[in-house]
Amino acid sequence: MKLAVHITFFYRDEKLDDRWTNAKDKFPYLRKIINEYNQYPLKVDIFIHTNKKFNLLDLKYNTYTNGKIQLIKHNLYKYSLFKGKNYYLTWASRKTIKKQRNEYDFFIYQEDDIFIPLNAFNYWQTNKQDCLKNNLNLGFLRIELKDEIEYVSDLDMKIDKLMNLDKREYVINDVNPYCAFWIYDKTELNKWIKSKFWDLKNIHGKGAIVSNKLEKIGLNNFPILRYLIYSYKNKRPDSAMEASAIGINGLNLGWYKNTVLPIKNSNVDPDCRIYHLSNYYANEYETNMGTIKFDEIIS
């Protein structure tokens, strides 16, 4: 059995006054991520997609014996006219993933500060099939730490809708299934690739790369004009990043009936936890994200 892991890593030398850390601040995240994949009980090949080449040895991870690690540099020139063009680095891995679709048994796409412990992978393997046969998505919760307390980063309200599935109780996450990564087996990935949703423009907002207005006046074949209109229609450039990391789990896509999490000891199964290593939301005060404790997520 083989797993392909695709990580988007935006390399920036300087640290600006915003939430995006520079490359050297993020190296410890990548090191922790790589060291964990080295413990997985199957071959894990890691592909790091970046805008700038760097020496992998600078990460100072343990000797990797569980597969290969490959750095792939991408040019973002085709997105030069888009607002927030750097966010579109998150789209760059799609071509490679499509080429690999029959070479691996499982696929993960993740952002560069997402830590997926082995027990979370085992949780997915154990529960995914029961969910898929009922057209449900098995959910995860992205966890952040504040004062050593675990908070759920992506939910601003508790979840409370329960359901039974094959004599087991689940809770429905109809608030926000996003957790900055996705995981699918080869069968599910190939279904996605054959669908219209493999084109991320069908997930990223309501903008269309093909403009009806340009078509009417005979200018639809000019890519610069198409890019400008698409960028204008999509007001939040960071939603390009979210479109890549949500996979086919989005609430408005209709691919699955719901995203669900199994109940264990009156709370969600603790193995559903994956970790946002930057701990950003739990330590900011501008939103309600990251304010609900993990052990209180079910109301």
Task: Identify what each model region corresponds to.
Residues 4-23:
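A conserved hydrophobic helix/loop-capping motif in glycosyltransferases and polysaccharide synthases
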Residues 19-30, 81-93, 116-120, 177, ...:
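Phosphate/oxyanion-binding active-site loops and adjacent basic polyanion-contact surfaces
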Residues 23-44:
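Short, acidic, metal-binding catalytic loop of nucleotide-sugar glycosyltransferases
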Residues 43-53:
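Short beta-strand/loop segment that forms part of the nucleotide-sugar
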Residues 54-105:
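Active-site-proximal specificity loops/subdomain of glycosyltransferases
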Residues 86, 117-216:
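Conserved catalytic core of nucleotide-sugar-dependent glycosyltransferases
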Residues 104-115:
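Short beta-strand-to-loop acidic/aromatic patch adjacent to the donor-nucleotide binding site
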Residues 195-299:
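C-terminal catalytic/acceptor-binding lobe
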